[in-house]
Regions:
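Acidic, Ser/Pro/Thr-rich low-complexity regulatory regions
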Residues: 2-90
């Protein structure tokens, strides 16, 4: 069983499918930082895509309720921070 750190929380993967899903989300979080430079208006879409993927981890029982709430809070803060940065960047 492999543990991957996602938004400051260790997520346990039981198989390759779970591991690749978490890696996709991790990449998505990294891309999120870069989005505002090229496409400030697509930040909202990127946020909802990531939010949906994190929700799927919750439904797959890979994260418990507290960790899910913590992740979504952190993701929302990241969204606000990135959106403000994008607005200042214009």
């Amino acid at each position: 069983m492999k543990k991957i750190n996602l938004l400051g929380i260790e997520v346990k993967c039981h198989n390759k499918r779970e591991e690749s899903l978490i890696c996709i989300i991790k990449r998505g979080v990294k891309d999120f930082y870069r989005t505002f430079k090229n496409k400030p208006y697509s930040i909202g879409d990127a946020y909802y895509r990531l939010f949906g993927k994190i929700e799927s981890l919750y439904f797959m029982d890979l994260v418990n309720h507290d960790n899910y709430k913590l992740m979504t809070d952190r993701l929302f803060n990241l969204y606000i921070f990135t959106r403000e940065k994008a607005e200042n960047h214009r």
